[in-house]
Structures are given as C-alpha cells and as structure tokens.
Amino acid sequence: MKKTLVIVAHPQIKESVVNQRWIEELRKHPDKFTVHEIYQVYPNGIIDVAKEQALIEAHENLIFQFPVYWFNCPPFFKQWLDDVFTYGWAYGSTGNKLKNKKIMLAVSAGIQSKDYSDTGRYQLSLNQALYPFELTALYVEADYQPIYAFYGTESNPTSEEVDQSAIHYVQKLILLANMTSKHF
C-alpha cells in the first residue's frame, strides 16, 4: 500500500497549536504518512513543480492541511495548487495523474462551528466556504472526501481537545487509506 501525502500549508507553523500537534501525531506513523511542509520547503516561494508532481504520484492519497484564512487557504498554498496542478498533468486531454486519487482537506478554523451554519454568523457551512476545493477535485477527477476540521482555534482550546483532535485525525486518515468505497 502506498503512503498518504499530507501537504501542510501553514505560514506560521511555529505559532500553531493545532497544526503542530497534528503534524506530531502524523510523524508517529512514518510508514503511513509523508508530511510535506511547503512553507518550510520553499521559503523563497519558488516551487519545484516536477518534484511536487513526482511526490504526489508516489502517494495514493492526498491531504491538504491548512488553517482557514479569510474563508480560504493561505496564499502560498493557492500558488502551489496553481503551479502544480498543471494542464497535461492534472487535467486536460492527457492530464490524469490525480484521477481517482483520494483528496481530503484537514483544516483548523479560528471561529466556532456554530458560526459555520445557515443560521450562524456567516450563514454558510465550512463545506460551502471551501467548496472551490471540492470543485477542483471534481475537475481533476479525484475522489474528494469530507473535510476534517478543528473549530475554535481563536478560543484557546484545551490541550486535551487538541490532543483528541490529533488522534482522531490520524485515525481518520488511516481509515481513508484502508477504504475501498468512494466516501467514508
């Protein structure tokens, strides 16, 4: 079985509580996960597209882990997507490298889950806010999976809450790697 590639796109990972803890938990399973921190790998912002594409091709599943920034992803991750998901590789008449590959978002959100609802402060769900990622997965014919989210990072979550989320996150990714049906 191929490993799962986790693309970590956090511009201030050293200040992150949740994303750092998730990375720690993932790194306990080097036989299952490759953790790839793009802000650390490319501090100058120049992406080695061929290297990134080869890394993706060498993995069965692709996880995008990032903090929600202004109801979107951090800017360098958007650049990474634009640069790496190229015509002829990710899409187009000969672009099929992501076809049927499982893709999932793992995000940390500053606001509470109640605010991400039809009746919440922003009147839309996190799935709705991040829908462009699902559309991207559909466009490249990947197998998009439900989002894994930790809400309320701005509300100083307890270390127990963060630890539980990290354990649950890794368990979910292990299940994802072992599943044969389309969604879990």
Regions found by a protein language model. Give the residues of each.
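Structural motif
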Residues: Y42-A50, P157-E161
